[in-house]
Regions:
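Short, compositionally stereotyped local motifs that mark structural "simplifiers"
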Residues: 1-217, 223-225, 230-235, 239-244
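Conserved ATP-binding subdomain of kinase catalytic cores across diverse folds
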Residues: 168, 202-308
């Protein structure tokens, strides 16, 4: 069962679970699409800290002590961060390898104005004993949905559904670190390439797609923690239907070496709720008794590759 999908990715700093049950932070506005910039109010019984770069406010050195409303504005002019990562690190669209030139990616990172942007606010509160609440995360788009997604009206009309847009917030290193990053070729690829090249002076670029890499690893060891905000969007606006911490892995076979990769999301008690509780496919997906299935342990975000 397929649905059209839009994906936004925001990476954060290193994360460890140091949170306990205390007064969580309440946001004055739910994540979504807003026509104009606004002032966001946060409330809690504890002292609130927040971040705007996707990092965990209970750990990050970029966290800000909340002392008044936060301006949420259009970020279309901001510089790229995740999208600025060199494609050479995570895909194999290379020119042929030679010892003189090495591996050179034929695709450049996109320009700043080519990447749609949103604002991710993460907040946590600390009580008088120094205990942190769970982190609350919300994602905001400023402008109309048509400003952010070209052709959304025609796309929704053609599919007969709203566009499912998922914002993913996770640790930057869990994506791009050479040792543990799941999105990159990484150390696994570098070691495999050394063995494959041996004494060769030249190899075909396509051969590198078949080499082992970080992104081709599987199993729980290569699952990372993430947060998702799931929106149903059309030309008239957006509705947030899921706001949840979960596990994330790379999805696919040969397509794992593509520029854009698929993801598989896992609901587990380790992260919070053990199910994604939403009828993602509406009435199209029913159980044997004819009831709409509205709880899932996992689902896949396809990237459109041949094995995605």
């Amino acid at each position: 069962f397929l649905r059209p999908l839009g994906l936004r990715l925001c990476s954060n700093g290193n994360k460890q679970d140091t949170h306990t049950d205390t007064s969580e932070v309440v946001f004055s506005r739910q994540g979504g699409v807003y026509d104009e910039e606004f002032e966001l109010e946060l409330t809690s019984k504890g002292i609130i800290y927040y971040t705007t770069d996707g990092s965990d406010p209970s750990e990050s050195d970029t966290s800000i002590k909340y002392d008044g409303e936060i301006k949420v504005a259009d970020r279309s002019g901001d510089a790229n961060i995740v999208s600025a990562v060199s494609p050479t690190l995570f895909c194999t669209n290379f020119s042929d390898y030679s010892k003189d030139a090495g591996l050179v990616c034929r695709i450049d990172a996109p320009s700043d104005d080519a990447v749609d942007k949103c604002t991710v606010i993460r907040a946590a509160a600390k009580d008088s004993a120094g205990n942190w609440s769970a982190v609350t995360t919300q994602t905001y788009f400023i402008g109309n949905t048509t400003d952010h997604i070209d052709g959304i009206e025609a796309g929704c009309k053609a599919s007969g559904n709203d566009l499912a847009v998922i914002s993913i917030t996770m640790d930057y290193d869990d994506l791009f670190d050479s040792g543990k990053g799941i999105y990159v070729k990484g150390d696994v690829f570098d070691n495999a390439l050394k063995k494959f090249i041996g004494n060769k002076n030249w190899i075909k670029a396509d051969d590198t797609r078949k080499l082992d890499a970080n992104y081709s690893q599987r199993g729980r060891e290569w699952e990372r923690e993430a947060h998702i905000d799931f929106f149903e969007m059309n030309e008239n606006g957006a509705k947030q239907v899921l706001n949840q911490d979960c596990g994330i892995r790379i999805q696919g076979n040969y397509s794992r070496s593509d520029l854009q990769k698929g993801f598989r999301l896992y609901a587990r008690k380790d992260y919070g709720d053990n199910k994604f509780r939403y009828d993602i496919w509406g009435d199209e997906l029913k159980d044997k008794d004819g009831n709409t299935i509205d709880k899932f342990k996992t689902f896949v975000l396809r990237a459109g590759g041949n094995c995605a």
